[in-house]
Regions:
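Conserved class I S-adenosyl-L-methionine
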Residues: 2-45
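Conserved acidic residues
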Residues: 48, 69, 112
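Class I SAM-dependent methyltransferase SAM/SAH-binding core
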Residues: 51, 57-104
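A short acidic, Gly/Pro-enriched loop at the edge of an enzyme's catalytic core
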Residues: 106-114
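A short beta-strand submotif of the Rossmann-like class I SAM-dependent methyltransferase core
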Residues: 113-117, 125
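A short, conserved alpha-helix within the catalytic core of class I
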Residues: 123-132
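Conserved catalytic/acceptor-binding region of the Class I
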Residues: 133-200
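Conserved Class I S-adenosyl-L-methionine
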Residues: 176, 180-281
Length: 281
């Protein structure tokens, strides 16, 4: 069995149902245009159907719907789904919004593309990977989408000091799946970087959209002190020139990454390697 680290437990995932987190989510950096271009190219089978697993505010679902016959956009946060519906493209009739954990969702395959943007690490991979394998078309793939944004801010000492996720550790779910023989990587492509220019307040709110920084869960004092620490560090680095601002906006950038491949059915993985056995040499 693949075991998620404690920092990716259901208890921590519940943060994404919080009203404050959903409100702050729109301040996350956008995916670079190249990410969407690549995802469109990965849809080769018909029907041109997309499953966006852990859709959040539906950034991928809303952008790709015009290129699809149908889209199932799934998230376990009702507030996320409500917000996604209200955003541009959220009323596209090709999108079916489903509020459900992906593990239990009532899905109607087959899908020519399954996307997981910043969400795969929160799933029970022992359940969803065999499920995805069954739902894909012959040439369909699972695309794991990531993005990284930076403005040059030194905050590695600030983040752990205030985060409520005391179990945080870096974990790569794709690497874990590959090691277990449950994912066959077919390709990887990066896009960007492209400019990202948030205001200071937008940058801070972006942090509050992340696990560990929900305003609904932090004490008012803790949240206020966290915000003040970020503002002070930004001011310090702007003064020294290591963080740049122009017309009230931070000058940063965002890059995207897509890893795509085929999820491996459980029976095949078990027969080839033993039950989640050692990595094939």
């Amino acid at each position: 069995m693949l075991t998620r680290p404690a920092c990716r437990s259901v208890a921590y995932a519940e943060t994404f149902k919080d009203r404050s987190v959903v409100a702050a989510y729109r301040h996350r950096p956008p995916h670079p245009p190249g990410t969407f271009d690549l995802l469109r190219q990965l849809i080769v089978d018909r029907p041109r159907s997309l499953l966006d697993a852990g859709t959040g505010l539906g950034d991928l679902a809303r952008a790709l719907a015009p290129n699809c016959d149908r889209v199932d956009a799934v998230d376990f946060s009702e507030r996320m789904i409500e917000m996604a519906r209200s955003l541009p493209g959220g009323d596209d009739p090709r999108i079916r919004w489903l509020c459900s954990p992906i593990e239990d969702a009532d899905l109607i395959g087959p899908y020519s593309l399954i996307t997981a943007a910043d969400s795969l690490s929160w799933f029970d991979l022992n359940v969803v990977i065999p499920k995805f394998a069954e739902l894909l078309t012959e040439n369909g793939v699972l695309a794991v989408v990531d993005r990284s944004a930076q403005v040059g801010l030194r905050e590695d000492d600030i983040i752990p000091r205030y985060s409520l996720n005391r179990d945080y550790e870096r974990w790569d779910p794709v690497a874990a799946l590959e090691k277990a023989g449950l994912f066959e990587r077919l390709g990887q492509e990066c896009s960007g970087p492209v400019p990202w220019t948030p205001t200071i307040e937008e940058y801070i709110e972006r942090r509050h959209s992340q696990n560990g920084f929900s305003r609904d869960r932090m004490s008012r004092r803790r949240a206020t002190d966290f915000d003040a620490a970020l503002r002070a560090r930004i001011a310090e680095q702007v003064k020294e020139g290591s963080v740049r601002m122009e017309e009230g906006r931070l000058l940063g950038e965002v890059a995207g990454s897509v890893v795509w491949g085929r999820p491996v059915p459980r029976l095949r993985a078990t027969s080839e390697r033993g039950i989640l056995g050692p990595t094939r040499q």
